[in-house]
């Protein structure tokens, strides 16, 4: 009787709690910056904003980076949320087109290409 009770109790405790699966990868966003003819842009500043108001005022960026020699920067450990992206290099930027990206997929390597002109 005691053995049956222990077995039932053990079975109930193992199956009554569902653990959240372990996330293997952090949510990230890789931004590739290109100019109007498709060439990658080295050294462009990239800022991510959570709201359109912050994007418009260029305040409270949640993350910032600079495009590398291949015109790429990877933001790591982001929330799975939509973002407004502002990219600038000298007198070129991406204002007026494609500033908002959709909600990032959680635990995935998200990618976007931004054109500046």
Residue ranges, per PLM feature:
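Sec-dependent N-terminal signal peptides
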Residues: 4-13
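Beta-strand-rich domain onsets/edges
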Residues: 14-28, 32-37, 95-98, 108-117
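Exposed beta-strand and adjacent loop surfaces of beta-rich binding modules
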Residues: 28, 43-45, 82-84
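Short, ordered, surface-exposed loop/turn motifs in non-cytosolic proteins
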Residues: 37-55
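Short, acidic Ser/Thr/Gly-rich low-complexity loop/linker segments typical of extracellular
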Residues: 54-72
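Surface-exposed loops/turns
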Residues: 69, 79-80, 106
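A short, solvent-exposed beta-strand micro-motif common in secreted/extracellular proteins
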Residues: 79-92
């Amino acid at each position: 009787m005691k053995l049956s009770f222990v077995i039932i109790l053990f079975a109930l405790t193992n199956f009554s709690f569902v653990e959240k699966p372990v996330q293997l990868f952090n949510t990230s966003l890789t931004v590739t910056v290109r100019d109007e003819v498709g060439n990658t842009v080295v050294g462009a500043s990239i800022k991510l904003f959570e709201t359109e108001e912050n994007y418009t005022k260029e305040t409270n960026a949640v993350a910032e980076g600079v495009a590398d020699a291949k015109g790429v920067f990877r933001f790591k450990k982001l929330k799975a949320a939509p973002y407004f992206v502002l990219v600038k290099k000298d007198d070129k930027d991406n204002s007026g087109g494609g500033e908002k990206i959709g909600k990032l997929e959680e635990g995935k390597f998200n990618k976007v290409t931004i054109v500046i002109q």
